[in-house]
From Swiss-Prot:
<keyword id="KW-0547">Nucleotide-binding</keyword>
<keyword id="KW-0460">Magnesium</keyword>
<dbReference type="GO" id="GO:0005524">
    <property type="term" value="F:ATP binding"/>
</dbReference>
<keyword id="KW-0479">Metal-binding</keyword>
<feature type="compositionally biased region" description="Basic and acidic residues">
    <location>
        <begin position="1"/>
        <end position="10"/>
    </location>
</feature>
<feature type="binding site">
    <location>
        <position position="271"/>
    </location>
    <ligand>
        <name>Mg(2+)</name>
    </ligand>
</feature>
<dbReference type="GO" id="GO:0070733">
    <property type="term" value="F:AMPylase activity"/>
</dbReference>
<comment type="function">
    <text>Nucleotidyltransferase involved in the post-translational modification of proteins. It can catalyze the addition of adenosine monophosphate (AMP) or uridine monophosphate (UMP) to a protein, resulting in modifications known as AMPylation and UMPylation.</text>
</comment>
<feature type="binding site">
    <location>
        <position position="103"/>
    </location>
    <ligand>
        <name>ATP</name>
    </ligand>
</feature>
<feature type="binding site">
    <location>
        <position position="102"/>
    </location>
    <ligand>
        <name>ATP</name>
    </ligand>
</feature>
<keyword id="KW-0464">Manganese</keyword>
<dbReference type="GO" id="GO:0000287">
    <property type="term" value="F:magnesium ion binding"/>
</dbReference>
<dbReference type="Pfam" id="PF02696">
    <property type="entry name" value="SelO"/>
</dbReference>
<feature type="binding site">
    <location>
        <position position="123"/>
    </location>
    <ligand>
        <name>ATP</name>
    </ligand>
</feature>
<feature type="binding site">
    <location>
        <position position="100"/>
    </location>
    <ligand>
        <name>ATP</name>
    </ligand>
</feature>
<keyword id="KW-0808">Transferase</keyword>
<feature type="binding site">
    <location>
        <position position="280"/>
    </location>
    <ligand>
        <name>ATP</name>
    </ligand>
</feature>
Amino acid sequence: MTHLHFDNRLRQQLPGDPEEGARRREVGAAWSSVLPTPVAAPYLIAHSAEMAQVLGLEAAEIASAQFAQVFGGNALYPGMQPWAVNYGGHQFGHWAGQLGDGRAISLGEAIGTDGGRYELQLKGAGPTPYSRGADGRAVLRSSIREFLCSEAMHHLGVPTTRALSLVGTGEAVVRDMFYDGHPQREPGAIVCRVAPSFIRFGNFELPSARGDIALLKQWVDFTIARDFPALAGAGEALYADWFAQVCERTAVMVAHWMRVGFVHGVMNTDNMSILGLTIDYGPYGWVDDYDPDWTPNTTDAQGRRYRFGTQPQVAYWNLGRLAQALAPLFADQALLQYGLDRFRDTYLACDRRDTAAKLGLAECRDEDLQLIDALRALMRESEMDMTLTFRGLIDLSPEHPDPAQLRDAFYDEDKRLVDAPQLQQWLQRYAARLQQDPLSPEERRARMRLANPRYVLRNYLAQQAIDRAEQGDPSGVQELLEVMRRPYDDQHGRDAFAARRPDWARDRAGCSMLSCSS
């Protein structure tokens, strides 16, 4: 018997539709009741030990057949009351109307051993009223990617939703991976995602767009009371403080993305968490050879709206859409602008903080922003790996800066040789700056190690684990999870996981760019 205790405040305190079944346009309801659709033979592939501990789940319970049944969608623990949430969103810059949880089903809000609230949500557990024409299922490859990235981002120190479990369904799912008219059968899986809240910008956009200001206000009041309990006051002042905090949290999140080289790939407003958590891991990726114009999403290959370098601007634009949705609650629109200004101020402060940390400086001067920009330009011109370049700077000697320290960061040997003088010039400039800095060599290296990961979840690493899992060997998933639990440490015997993208992976599907097919 589970020790999980559920307190399902969203379902209790927001208006919903208790009717299960038919897919429909839902008006006036924040959520709809829905049951997961049972699968043939659920089996546990992997789980997060840390997340299980927070929830108070013991090893014997996780290993039980009942656990796979529950988190495979075939059974419920006492207190679970499944629902799907209704929301809208802007997708690639255009209003898309009602979207909703098309294949995500929340089982309940559990109270953890730390007293925190943790919503448990199955992704791929079958259709909901918001599935439109889809089957509500998920394939193994996308589920592995979401499971691994949720935990990898947490251990990198990036605000994120978490993952408890990855369960195979024992059933096949038909997907057209490349949208080229050649669908194939793939193994199915279900991820249990975990977060204090899965509320999105789109939860406020939809009622506002429909003119349902009463429901909009209910969403805002509920979100503040449950998820922002430290905020005090009432009326517009309270709403303004809340919006400013949402803006601040979003800025912190995106700054972390830029620090570690993460590209979300689909920054639609329905994929933006009101808590400033990274959410919805689809066609994401990590920057290999540095390119601010790179996106891993094939759907965005031409417009590149969500490319790496524009993520801060897109986040600001998305917050503008949220402000627009909240505007009916404000007589004084200037209060919303204050929140948007808070985003910019917070992001710039985070950028300066991260610049100092990545370069091993006590503080970031204005000229240090120019210094790191010059390095980025050099990385782009010379096809240098972002992660390996910054990690390689840790052991650089300020007295004798040697370009050989960064040899492994180059993808093109010819460019390494041609651009060697420019790199040497930059390193000398950097070394001179280090000699002006008050940090000791030990303090500098320690600071840099905490800002520059050695291991990131490169797409080719995830794809190798997927390939093995699809052949019946899930050990690669567990091994990769273990490596990503300590991304800033030098792990003995695991150099292969820190290597730059191999040549064979440059253009292979799943290793460079990905579709939204999942």
